[in-house]
């Protein structure tokens, strides 16, 4: 399977390292309700590596933390030419979403190889054997969101699929005239899925007109544009490449600014009973 390059633009980590002449001033903050990780702090010296991944580095921007956000991890993966893995994750209980933002990769599962470009989205269920490689002469960058799949007796696991940002028609929120839209890569009524990773789009001036306060944990990576985001009583100026990591019940709202759409990749946990143990 070969896919088509996306018409959308996607922010990448800053990488590199600020010069010694740079005056320290940044927006990063970690609170008991949310973390705000600006693009400017995603430099070379905060990357990591993974077992059995060749010519690859990653920024870890979310991981399960007791008493904070506990359900998922979020990596930004950078795979150099001829890099990748035949053994990407030994945890057979983890499910995966991959969203490509630069370059291209070859994703192999069920005896088929799929060439994914910027804007492609892949869902890989728990227990699936898969491989990923970059055969091109430039690096590939993608988001990798992992969650332990919550098995339910009598409900089958979801099946793997590949789609794209362009292929999914955004759904407008009620009474917003298309100013606030969500691209849903999974049918929200499909109870097999216990996480959704969507793209939310606001046109300039669009807003969330109330403080959303709910049980879902969130990871929000700004793909494009800028705005002001309300988080647990604080207003934060956000722009492409910034990341917001929210625990359950963190109040949130936003107001899109600038002259281009404000778009972010959004993780949330869904469709399961609340655990009655800590």
Regions found by a protein language model. Give the residues of each.
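Ligand-binding loop in jelly-roll beta-barrel domains
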Residues: 113, 126-152, 248-274
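Conserved short histidine dyad/triad with adjacent acidic residue
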Residues: 55-64, 73-92, 183-186, 198-214, ...
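Surface-exposed interaction/gating patches
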Residues: 162-219, 223-229, 235-236
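C-terminal functional regions that serve as terminal interaction/effector modules
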Residues: 2-25, 29-32, 210-213, 217-224, ...
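Short, conserved beta-strand element in jelly-roll/cupin
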Residues: 76-80, 90-107, 199-203, 213-231
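Short acidic-glycine-tyrosine-enriched beta hairpin
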Residues: 110-126, 233-248
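A short, N-terminal "cap"/entry segment at the start of jelly-roll beta-barrel domains
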Residues: 2-71, 137, 146-195, 277
């Amino acid at each position: 399977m070969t896919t088509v390059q996306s018409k959308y633009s996607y922010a990448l980590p800053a990488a590199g390292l600020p010069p010694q002449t740079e005056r320290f001033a940044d927006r990063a903050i970690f609170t008991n309700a949310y973390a705000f990780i600006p693009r400017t702090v995603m430099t070379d010296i905060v990357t990591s590596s993974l077992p059995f991944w060749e010519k690859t580095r990653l920024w870890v921007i979310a991981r399960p933390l007791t008493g904070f956000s506990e359900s998922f991890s979020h990596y930004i993966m950078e795979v150099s030419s001829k890099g990748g893995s035949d053994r990407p994750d030994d945890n057979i209980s983890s499910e995966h979403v991959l969203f490509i933002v630069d370059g291209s990769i070859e994703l192999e599962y069920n005896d088929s190889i799929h060439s994914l470009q910027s804007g492609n989205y892949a869902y890989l269920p728990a227990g699936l054997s898969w491989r990923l490689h970059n055969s091109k002469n430039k690096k590939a960058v993608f988001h990798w969101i992992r969650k332990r799949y919550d098995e339910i007796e009598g409900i089958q696991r979801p099946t793997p699929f590949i789609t794209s940002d362009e292929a999914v028609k955004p759904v407008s929120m009620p009474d917003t005239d298309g100013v606030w839209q969500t691209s849903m890569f999974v049918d929200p009524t499909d109870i097999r899925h216990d996480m959704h990773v969507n793209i939310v789009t606001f046109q300039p001036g669009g807003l969330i007109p109330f403080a959303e306060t709910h049980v879902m944990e969130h990871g929000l990576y700004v793909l494009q544009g800028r705005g002001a985001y309300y988080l647990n009583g604080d207003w934060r100026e956000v722009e492409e490449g910034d990341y917001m990591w929210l625990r359950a019940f963190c109040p949130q709202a936003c107001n899109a600014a600038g002259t281009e759409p404000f778009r972010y990749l959004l993780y949330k946990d869904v469709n399961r009973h609340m655990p009655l143990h800590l």
